[in-house]
A protein has these predicted regions:
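Short glycine/serine/threonine-rich phosphate/pyrophosphate-binding segments
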Residues: 61
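Extended beta-strand/beta-hairpin segments
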Residues: 1-53, 64-150
Length: 150
């Protein structure tokens, strides 16, 4: 990536609809796509699943970056997501997520500020904004809950 743009390649791998995708920056990290039987063989992510995972990864990266910038030491972080599908056209109409954060000396106000900043700074969130309803929440894990997530 030399000018801020991204390049990727997607290649058909069988006689159905299994594909492998790579990016120019990660040519050795293959992402497999497929679809449900009988159209596919269920040997990879479906497109909307991968979109949900991509959204979650981008949002998580932004959240953790912001928390560390605030001087927080993160013991545990988990983001659970749910995508609500619509028909005609098939797409995600709503993404709901809940972040569970285990960090010392973090307040509810700091969590709320981090959520607002994440919405502004997350590239994938910005990409879906206006097309997909996003409802996000975050909560602080107790010390006991942190131990369960290790």
């Amino acid at each position: 990536m030399n000018n801020g743009n991204f390049k990727a390649e997607v290649t058909l791998k069988n006689q159905k609809v299994k594909f492998e995708g790579i990016s120019e920056n990660n040519p050795n990290r293959v992402v497999e796509f497929d679809y449900l039987k009988p159209i596919g063989d269920e040997e990879g992510f479906r497109g909307l699943e991968l979109m949900l995972v991509t959204f979650g990864g981008c949002v998580s990266t932004t959240m953790v970056f912001l928390l560390r910038k605030m001087g927080k030491i993160i013991e545990t972080f988990k983001l659970r997501l749910e995508g609500e599908k619509q028909e005609n056209p098939v797409s995600l109409k709503k993404i709901t997520f809940e972040a569970k954060i285990g960090a010392d000396n973090i307040t509810t106000n700091e969590i709320q500020e981090m959520l607002k900043m994440t919405e502004k700074l997350s590239p994938v969130w910005n990409m879906v904004k206006g097309n997909v309803e996003v409802i996000g929440n975050a909560s602080i894990l107790s010390n006991e809950e942190c131990l369960k997530h290790v």
